Design a protein with these regions (language model features):
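Non-heme Fe(II)/2-oxoglutarate
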Residues: 2-135
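A short glycine-rich, His/Asp/Glu-containing loop-to-beta-strand
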Residues: 131-151
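Conserved short histidine dyad/triad with adjacent acidic residue
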Residues: 145-163
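A short hydrophobic beta-strand segment most commonly corresponding to one strand
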Residues: 167-173, 196-198, 212-230
Length: 246
């Protein structure tokens, strides 16, 4: 089956499901997590690995218009990303990592050992984006990238991890109408501009940009501090209240 028809079939299967249809209720032992360090850690781990949550919006403000302006100004510096995997119009540029044009994981390239991840030359050209990232609740960064999906572009059906579970953070710098992120058993992600979401990239997913504008997101890999753990717990509590209310 060729790639397009495979995606079409996948989209039809996704559209049979609401995004949060199959999330799990919070276990009773985590009810008193607030103010309890160990419970906060345990509850956040449960959310990431066992809640069956496809994406979780965190309450982190984003200067989306400033970041979008910097990204679009530097769009000529973006390179094709994973274009040998059936993707089309998928571009990327690294602001923190090995180098601006090294958009895959370090072991994709021919390094003998993991190189230093640091601010790239692109960071100097995107000072507002860098300043926001420096205030982000993260203990350290690995790869931080701009991701662009051009008008008419497609991110082919794939998954990034073998196991389900919330993992990387995806930030919607913009998200044009008619650009949809389809997820296995979870419909589409209800993106709004400025959303910061933990994403389950162990699910099969695909993105199709049927708009006339480039879709600009950021993907953040790093070490999360306690603020991210607390945000995870607070966000899942709020999601649960909305989803399981009777």
């Amino acid at each position: 089956m060729h790639g397009e028809s495979r995606i079409e079939e996948f989209i039809k299967s996704c559209n049979r499901h609401e995004h949060y249809a199959y999330i799990q209720p919070r276990p009773a032992q985590y009810a008193a997590w607030r103010g309890n360090h160990n419970l906060t850690v345990e509850y956040s781990e449960w959310v990431w690995k066992q809640s069956n949550c496809p994406s979780l919006k965190l309450n982190i403000p984003v200067p989306a218009l400033d970041i979008l302006e910097e990204a679009l100004t530097n769009l000529s510096r973006f390179v094709s990303h994973r274009d040998n995997e059936g993707n089309s119009g998928w571009l990327s540029a690294t602001i923190h990592g090995v180098d601006t044009h090294f958009t895959n994981a370090w072991n994709y390239y021919n390094f003998e050992s993991e190189p230093t991840h640091t601010w790239t030359a692109l960071a100097d050209l995107c000072p507002k984006t860098k300043a926001w990232l420096e205030s982000f609740p993260c203990t350290s960064y690995q790869r931080v990238r701009f991701m662009c999906l051009e008008p008419g572009g497609v991110i082919a059906l794939h998954r990034d991890n073998a196991e389900r579970g919330l993992d990387a953070i995806n930030v919607a710098i913009n998200n044009p109408a008619n650009c949809n992120f389809y997820m296995e058993d979870a419909g589409t992600i209800p993106w709004r501009v400025g959303d910061v979401r933990l994403i389950d990239i162990g699910r099969y997913h695909a993105v199709v940009n049927n708009s006339d504008a480039p879709r600009i997101h950021m993907i953040i890999h790093g070490g999360w501090n306690m603020e991210i753990l607390k945000q995870t717990c607070e966000s899942y509590d709020e999601l649960s209240r909305l989803h399981f209310q009777h």
